[in-house]
Amino acid sequence: MKSQVVLSKLSPQLGKRHLEVMDDLESMLDKGKSFSTMSDLAKQLKISLRTLYEIAPSKEELIVTTVDRVLKKHGKIAMDAMNAHSSPIKKLESFLTVANQAVGPRFERFTLSLSSLNSSKPMVDYHEQYITELIKNLLDEARIKNEIKEIDTQATALLLGGLGRYFQSKKLFKDLHQTPEKTSNLLTKIIIDGIKMEKS
């Protein structure tokens, strides 16, 4: 099976102006700015309230849609890095190095915006499933090509795909000697090195 995951697209009704507004909102969230209502955001961005409601029906959905778009753009960067290699295990290493940036300080500002939104769960679940499936496909390919040992690829995919989010937990963060991103990259390397076939 080829390593391919289809990313869902934004509504085809969104035009260039809507995407520009989402870029502006992304920039706002990136700087740690907030807004209390859709009207407040419209004033800050100096646009009509109608334009915002054409993108999403509520403040919560607008935040979820924007963060979803940020994660998909980051996912494309990870896919591009992965596709520079022909070896499945090299693809996996490249993908995870970029994917683990999603628990870095910049992305933490975005994910914090979702912490109190119940409507964000389907989107977060979608991205987790996307990453897990991609990792499993790459592990399966690596096993077929004898690049890795005989392992449970599903369990390993769940582990590798969930490291970043696990270490981003506030309960664990204070006890880490490194950032969640660096810790995730370190353990990713240990795990992948441990499952690689030994060179004769």
Regions found by a protein language model. Name each.
Residues 67-75:
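Short, basic, alpha-helical segments at the C-terminal edge of helix-turn-helix-like DNA-binding modules
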Residues 28, 73, 102-110, 138, ...:
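A short secondary-structure junction motif
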Residues 72, 119-144, 154-158, 166-169:
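Amphipathic alpha-helical packing segments from all-alpha helical-bundle domains
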